[in-house]
Amino acid sequence: MHNKPVALVTGANQGIGLQIAKDLVAHGFTVLVGSRNLERGEAAAKQVGPDARALQLDVTDQASIAAAAERIRKELGRLDVLVNNAAISNTSKQPGMSVQQYAKLTRPSNVSLDEVRAVWETNVFGVLAVTQAMLPLLREAQAARIVNVSSGVGSLTRNSDPGYAYRSIFGPGYAASKTALNAMTVAMAIELEPTGIKVNAACPGYTKTNLNNYTGTRTVAEGAREPVRLALLPPGGPTGTFSNDDGPLPW
């Protein structure tokens, strides 16, 4: 059995996921850098350091997920932390198009169903598929943690408020996929509470990453802060919560 705690971060070859991997290694973890493209994952793992291992993982591909779980089982025997970070914001946004411009093309009245399905395939169904595959490994740990990287734009409470600044970009694609992810977080937390596995959702804030064409206002170090905190929760920590680094967020 591997001595160090083991973490898997999906979508960890760049952005917030890469920073989460770096931070968890700094806390003594062996980190599996999940990446659809193995070559990019290997390059990212080199950045993280000797305690990082690249792992080919496409969250929309059941065969890839199963192979990743089997490799972890054979090489490490368990999983202490799962960070479901992999996400896409769209499939059709043109280079240089602002978030606001894209939002106008993805209203409930005009959005392509193929676009919605593609975003949800990664952001919702991918999270469920990976979590299901990794649960046997998480159950082998003494106090496993699952962190779902969500977004405040998925908050129904906020979007129901006419004064909410980002209300205009709420739509069936990315934003609603994060609403669904929040619901899944609660469902997972309810089921797993008797096992001691804690499941929480983290909002990294508007972080400068490829997801938003690097238009965000926060650094990846700031964006990774809350997911890492939740990954390191002590035994008495909460489960079934939604928060950012300023505190709890409304569902």
Regions found by a protein language model. Name each.
Residues I88-W120, R139-P194:
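Catalytic loop of short-chain dehydrogenase/reductase
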Residues V9-T10, N84-N85, R145-S151, K198-C203:
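Structural signature of the Rossmann-like NAD(P)-dependent dehydrogenase/reductase core
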Residues M1-L32:
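Canonical Rossmann dinucleotide-binding motif of NAD(H)/NADP(H)-dependent dehydrogenases/reductases
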Residues H27-A43:
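Conserved glycine-rich Rossmann-like NAD(P)H-binding loop of the short-chain dehydrogenase/reductase
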Residues V83, V130-M134, L138, M184-T185, ...:
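Hydrophobic positions on the long internal alpha-helix
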Residues L38, Q56-E70:
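The beta1-alpha1 cofactor-binding region of Rossmann-like NAD(H)/NADP(H)-dependent oxidoreductases
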Residues T179, P194, A201-A202, T209, ...:
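C-terminal helical subdomain
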